[in-house]
């Protein structure tokens, strides 16, 4: 199997960290989605990364679905409970972190078009702020939700260095600083 992804995709980074933690070899094929490469469109007609191409040629798309596949590939994995409250806590935390990424990417696309202010932009910043406040209360381990939170805030630091998320979220800062120093995160750091 191989992961079609861009080097700076935070969604792909989440999957690369998960694979690393699970001991899964996950080759990455650097893919530029805006170029509509044939391999990506064959795997995901939406033209979005990441996409996981399996050995039989079939594909799994969307980072939460790929994450679920990776977790299911390792019986007895310790990154997420298979059922019960712990499972749903991790999935909900993953959704919050992915929502932060969604809002941040909307802001990046808007900035590329010169849109840096207005109700839609303000709404994205408010969504990020609210989600971070909740994530600040949900972190503390090293499971799926924790990984997703660290990826999200590291992406904010990477793409929005002037955004002051750290001063309001001390638990999230401590959590991210701890996880970002681990081998899985160091190995998947995006290029500058």
Question: How would you name each of these model-derived features?
Answer:
Residues 75, 102, 140, 184-185:
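Generic structural signal for secondary-structure transition and capping sites
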Residues 77-82, 106, 165-166, 186-191:
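Short, hydrophobic secondary-structure boundary micro-motifs
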